[in-house]
Amino acid sequence: MYPIFLLVSSCFLFSVLAALIKFGSQFIHPIEQAFFRNLISILLLIPFVIQTKKIINKSSNIKLLVLRGIFGGITMILLFWSYSLIPLSQAMAVSFSTPLFIYLGAILFFKEKTSRLNNFIILLGFILTIIIIRPDLEIKFGVILALIAAITHAIAGLLVKKISRNESVITLMFSMVLLMTPIAGIPTMMVWSTPNIYQLYLLIIISVIATLGNFCWTKALSITKLTNLMSFDFSKLLFTTILGFIFFDEKIDLITIICGSGLILCSNIKFISVRRNEKNKTILPDN
């Protein structure tokens, strides 16, 4: 239950983050927002790093930490950029290929056992998402950015699962923003615009929400099977669709409502299944 709560919380926080980035893109380029998001996150995490004392240990895999940072940096820049170019619901819908990639990666690389229900829900969720996207529509630059980000995000997620066996969540988060700051900083120089005091407040809020969302996401992936979580990742589409409708006057058509309802049903079925399994484990006596 706790991992599911963490993942759904991260979905909500990332949806709010997407809305803030879209709003902020009117004044600050998304790449510059990505740079400040990481820079401010370093400052936010330093007290926790000091408390941890030893952030890198003998068993740390530096190469994987660097790889995770690189893929995370690419994901962030591309996602932030896509939010400014296409409707939130469409950007988030495209990113829903990420759960499918992570799901398949968990089975192939981590040999996680799955069930027919898991397979059915993840496949149905992906199909419903594709219907919402409607690929027959014009493929815009923002859609391409979101799709590439979905692939790099999945790779980053699989690396998190691999590294989390030996690393703390703080190590994973701090190493990521430490690497992502220069990655986002280089292209930021080409689009730089000095933020005023109000824009700086917005950047701080973006960074705080992104840091909280990343903590929930990283923690959730590190403490349970990936195949048990990915069906709940579709809740992001519901959150972003609602936020887009309320704040950006983005239209919600009948197809989106029907498919969105299907995604909610998928998540509820999976939730009931997890609860039932937990109760069965509790009832079974110890041998």
Predicted features along the sequence, with ranges:
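Juxtamembrane helix-entry segments on the extracytoplasmic side of multipass membrane proteins
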Residues: 1-3, 35, 57-61, 134-155, ...
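C-terminal-most transmembrane helix of multi-pass membrane proteins
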Residues: 234-287
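Loop-to-transmembrane alpha-helix entry segments
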Residues: 95, 111-131, 140-143, 197, ...
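Transmembrane alpha-helical segments that form core, pore/gating elements
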Residues: 19-22, 30, 45, 136-195, ...
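Hydrophobic/small/kink-forming positions within alpha-helical transmembrane segments
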Residues: 11-16, 46, 69, 73-77, ...
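Membrane-interface interhelical linkers
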Residues: 1-12, 42-67, 116, 165, ...
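Helix-helix packing/entry segments at the starts of transmembrane helices
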Residues: 36, 91-97, 163-178, 214-246
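Alpha-helical transmembrane segments of compact multi-pass small-molecule transporters, enriched
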Residues: 40-44, 94-108, 120-123, 179-183, ...
